[in-house]
């Protein structure tokens, strides 16, 4: 019997089972113990293969692919700390609803806890974060193939969001020529190999039904809060709210067109919050709200009913309102709950939103990150997409810009970490094939610098803007101790990215004014390559501009 040959047949069943659940993208890191899985993936023509040498970046690459494709994406890594590097992407997927499959190779049981090299306790290492965890036995013909494939099917059939961890121990030898070992074991699955359906088909989960009293509530004074959703859903939500005559507070990730722009500015005005107190119902569509003032209002509002609609399970309401948690696809829910044409009931808020935007426009000429956030719409590629980093940049865009309705926007706003942002952007571009504008801060770029290797392989123009304000200037907005702020919070690195771009053979620009920035964009959108645009700005200007605008708008 050939151990290496049967390892590969066992792995081939696992990989083929994944294809029955929509897996097309598979991300592979180098490793020896994962050889059976890697070779099985390489031999399966259903997969699009992606490789990366850094497992943490690999996880975020898969996350980006899953964001766009809306399908589960698989990863293959070797044993040891390579597995632990997938943790951040797994956590993010659990919070934002992407589907990830972690295929982690492992040493066999007799090599665990005995000093063997690269052998750690992998089963259960991700605690409660996976939706489902499977610790497979060592490959053996004593276990029928139908058990293996149905085990995979059960885990993936019940996967609606988050990750599945499949731990796969393999004994040596891992290499060798294929022979007939295990062929009859594999063939007992019969015509499943020619079919395209799972061996075990799980019934779909139940979703929230139509709210029978909707006809009553739609006649009341309501507010629509739009969180993270798809571009198509964003356009539908905007029309739905407009028909109802309800004010729509749109997050940067809502893709609604934010008809009442600069919400995180005007929500700091007492006239706006006073008017919103008249709302009898708040319907929040989508989660992951960004703006600080929006979150403060959301926490303090007390309507008669607060409904949250999202297809991700869980409460999704840190304010713990009395109301309804409705698990449903947003577009489907809107169809079940049609709007009734009514006149807008808010008078003060549209005026404040217009005045807030005019205050922002009055400051747009200076060359800084707040102004870039406002101008970002001017630089979006046609038929393209936007990827927004975390920390200060996403808050500035949320507060100061007005993104077009239905324009795809992606971000990692689940756990909101700055790790893996460039890798995620790479996955977003690969899955869509669209021109992509990505914008991150300097610390975020440093954190994931080796992901520039992934950005060498793009199918359409990708522009990465690195806003270099020399540190974590988000902490300038927080009451951090002045005496310790720079050393322990901002942590300025005093670096530039020209040589990093050159190392990975990426185009690079460092504009000094808006005209040079526009010229750099015009050049970048012409060719299907990656261009790094480093925008060096005064360190505290962005945070100070936001604070000044907040003070100005609060007194309108």
Swiss-Prot record:
It comes from Escherichia coli (strain ATCC 8739 / DSM 1576 / NBRC 3972 / NCIMB 8545 / WDCM 00012 / Crooks). Belongs to the TPP enzyme family. MenD subfamily. Its cofactor is Mg(2+); Mn(2+); thiamine diphosphate. Pathway: Quinol/quinone metabolism; 1,4-dihydroxy-2-naphthoate biosynthesis; 1,4-dihydroxy-2-naphthoate from chorismate: step 2/7; Quinol/quinone metabolism; menaquinone biosynthesis. Binds 1 thiamine pyrophosphate per subunit. Keywords: Magnesium, Manganese, Menaquinone biosynthesis, Metal-binding, Thiamine pyrophosphate, Transferase. Catalyzes the thiamine diphosphate-dependent decarboxylation of 2-oxoglutarate and the subsequent addition of the resulting succinic semialdehyde-thiamine pyrophosphate anion to isochorismate to yield 2-succinyl-5-enolpyruvyl-6-hydroxy-3-cyclohexene-1-carboxylate (SEPHCHC). HAMAP family: MenD. Its EC number is 2.2.1.9. This is 2-succinyl-5-enolpyruvyl-6-hydroxy-3-cyclohexene-1-carboxylate synthase. GO terms for molecular function: 2-succinyl-5-enolpyruvyl-6-hydroxy-3-cyclohexene-1-carboxylic-acid synthase activity; magnesium ion binding; manganese ion binding; thiamine pyrophosphate binding. One of its GO terms (biological process) is menaquinone biosynthetic process. Homodimer. Pfam families: TPP_enzyme_C, TPP_enzyme_M_2, TPP_enzyme_N. The lineage of its organism: Bacteria, Pseudomonadati, Pseudomonadota, Gammaproteobacteria, Enterobacterales. The keyword NADP does not apply. It catalyses: isochorismate + 2-oxoglutarate + H(+) = 5-enolpyruvoyl-6-hydroxy-2-succinyl-cyclohex-3-ene-1-carboxylate + CO2.
